[in-house]
């Protein structure tokens, strides 16, 4: 897109999103932070699985700390979207209940979703 290759187009797009109430600064902070912190969390797991690091109290504490950082960015996303964390979880539960009749995971339904199932 033009906004991805031209600074003025990007600037115009950011203004447009701001005028629509997108709270783009907080959304971008949240999106970048969730991915960065998720990567740090996964890095610890990767080292335990593939590089012989132990599942030790220190590594567990490190994961908890990274998870806390990740949760802070999730909170930023919730604030940007003006939705509570509890509402996000409730919506996810409702989505999964609709996707998996009977409440049990099924590979078929995970790969063959109904129309509108995000």
Predicted feature descriptions by range:
Residues 1-118:
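Flexible "arm" and connector segments at domain edges
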